[in-house]
UniProtKB/Swiss-Prot annotation:
It comes from the Bacteria. This is Broad specificity amino-acid racemase RacX. The lineage of its organism: Bacteria, Bacillati, Bacillota, Bacilli, Bacillales. Belongs to the aspartate/glutamate racemases family. NCBIfam families: asp_race. Optimum pH is 8.5 with L-lysine as substrate. Its EC number is 5.1.1.10. The active site is at C82, C191. Keywords: Isomerase, Sporulation. Optimum temperature is 37 degrees Celsius. Homodimer.
């Protein structure tokens, strides 16, 4: 059974589940209801605020508590569709006896080799942790970052969490995208909240969606357990 530790943020859960369902159709031809995997989905509230620093101890505790509760339901492995939570990946995995997929590793696999200039869009804690930048630089890719881009991403994430946000968030995204596209040949969406906007836009340069990469790996791992 697939375990999904979701709710970070709440609006990222349903797009992730949709992507898992899509990959069931793409990877093994699921069509009838009975063809889809058993999934245990636990939406775990966490003390994340887009406008203030994270209390890492409280954040880590909330996620580990959620992961342990999810494991007790009998899941075979866990997918956690939240990039910021992967700052604590080692501690979370140590608290579990089942494996947890790593969203960064799965996302990096999908980056095309010709890409040389990457922009990583994520929360302040994700960017500050450099969990993407370290791997990208190790692969010979330049990571471009500007402080005012980060401020715009922070505003975008905060706006997504509000009701009836689409018109406002698409305008915020368009302004940010127009500048980023002049500097980068690939964008990495390292925040699953951004799917609320990015799933509905077109881009002339590739956007690597960490949520989709994790969903693909979730289904591939499920199939490996079935074989």
């Amino acid at each position: 059974m697939i375990g999904i530790l979701a709710g970070m943020g709440p609006k990222s859960t349903s797009p992730f589940i949709d992507k898992v369902i899509d990959y069931c159709q793409k990877l093994y031809g699921a069509s009838n209801d009975i063809d889809y995997p058993h999934m245990m989905i636990y939406s775990c509230p966490t003390p994340f605020y887009a406008d203030r620093p994270i209390d890492h101890d409280e954040m880590k505790k909330a996620i580990i508590d959620g992961a342990v509760k999810l494991e007790k339901t009998g899941v075979d492995f866990i997918a956690l569709p939240c990039n910021t939570a992967h700052v604590y990946y080692e501690e979370i995995q140590q608290a579990l006896s089942v494996p947890m997929l790593h969203i960064v590793e799965e996302t990096i696999k999908e980056i095309p080799h010709p890409a040389k200039k990457a922009v990583v869009l994520g929360t302040e804690p994700t960017i500050q942790s450099a969990i993407y930048q370290k791997v990208l630089k190790g692969n010979g890719q330049e990571v471009i970052h500007k402080d005012h881009w980060q401020q715009a991403v922070n505003q975008l994430i905060a706006a997504i969490k509000q009701p009836n946000h689409m018109q406002h968030t698409q305008a915020l995204w368009q302004t940010l995208y127009e500048e980023i596209s002049q500097h980068a040949d690939i964008i990495i969406s390292a925040c699953t909240d951004l799917n609320a906007v990015l799933d509905h836009i077109q881009s002339e340069i590739p956007i690597i969606d960490s949520s989709a990469c994790l969903a693909k790996s979730t289904v591939s791992t499920y199939l490996a357990y079935q074989s």
